[in-house]
Amino acid sequence: MNNSRFLVIDKEILPDIFEKVIEAKELLRTNQVKGVTEATKAVGISRSAFYKYKDYVYTLSDSNVGKKVTLSFLLSHQAGVLSNVLHIISVNNGNILTINQDSPINNFANVNIIFDITEISKKLDDIIQEIESIDGVEKLEILALE
């Protein structure tokens, strides 16, 4: 994996095996099972499949690939929308590094935020879902994970 390149891919287009490997790793990490055999049986995969992929499949939150994320937003031009986004990042221990905001055009503004996720208190996926639920967040994309 020294010269590996990483991709961010929506799990909807991947074979189920990858998500099942993640589930088995989570069972092991949280001590809900005694070992690999029990974990693989619980999620319905073979041990060989688990061992084949376990070192190559991560969630965004689990990955040691990087500790900075760049998010791109399309926000409606209403009072408090950006403040609410920043609040969610802050209360989850995200450390905001940069914010770039364009002037609103047709009542929408593009915003890019880079923040450190080293100390976040929730999974990145959960934080993103929380941000997406804010009234006025019209679009959110992960541009980079470093």
From Swiss-Prot:
What Pfam families would the database entry show?
ACT_4 (PF13291)
Identify the CDD domains for this entry: ACT_PheB-BS
Q: Which residues form the ACT domain?
A: 70-145
What InterPro entries does the annotation carry? ACT-like_dom_sf, ACT_dom, UPF0735_ACT_dom-cont
Entry's family note: Belongs to the UPF0735 family.
Cross-referenced NCBIfam families: PRK04435.1
Q: What is this protein called?
A: UPF0735 ACT domain-containing protein Clos_1956
